[in-house]
Amino acid sequence: MAQLTVQVVTPDGIRYDHHASLITVRTPDGEMGILPGHINLIAPLNVHQMKINRSHQEGVDWVAVNGGIIEVNEDQVTIVADSAERARDIDLNRAERAKERAERALEKAQTTQNIDEMRRAEVALRRAINRISVGKK
């Protein structure tokens, strides 16, 4: 049976490297499923969870991906992101604290009507919520 080779790469190194039968990611155009034999492509990714179905009996892996790009070339899938964490590596307490900090920063930015700070806080909040969601899987 054909399989994908999936790598998730960040500036800190390879965060995930395994074979898969299906991966699901979120792009600005919506959710995308990649199966073996998928057409070659490069696409931007949203801050979202990535679902990796390993072979039939091996289960599912979840990775919190904070944006980046996906490249599919033959049956090699490479995700390049600023940061990414596997569900098993996420410290939920730390993620909850990051969410609280982002909420406070967003509230302050809204009060002062600082658009740049508001955008930064919104991104930080999305990332924290994504990490919490994946960490609970």
Swiss-Prot record:
It is a peripheral membrane protein. CDD domains: F1-ATPase_delta. GO terms for cellular component: plasma membrane; proton-transporting ATP synthase complex. GO terms for molecular function: ATP binding; proton-transporting ATP synthase activity, rotational mechanism. Signal peptide: none annotated. Pfam families: ATP-synt_DE, ATP-synt_DE_N. InterPro entries: ATP_F1_dsu/esu_C_sf, ATP_synth_F1_dsu/esu, ATP_synth_F1_dsu/esu_N, ATP_synth_F1_esu_C, ATPsynth_dsu/esu_N. It is found in: Cell membrane. Belongs to the ATPase epsilon chain family. PANTHER family: ATP SYNTHASE DELTA/EPSILON CHAIN (PTHR13822), ATP SYNTHASE EPSILON CHAIN, CHLOROPLASTIC (PTHR13822:SF10). F-type ATPases have 2 components, CF(1) - the catalytic core - and CF(0) - the membrane proton channel. CF(1) has five subunits: alpha(3), beta(3), gamma(1), delta(1), epsilon(1). CF(0) has three main subunits: a, b and c. Produces ATP from ADP in the presence of a proton gradient across the membrane. This is ATP synthase epsilon chain. It comes from Streptococcus agalactiae serotype V (strain ATCC BAA-611 / 2603 V/R). The gene is atpC.
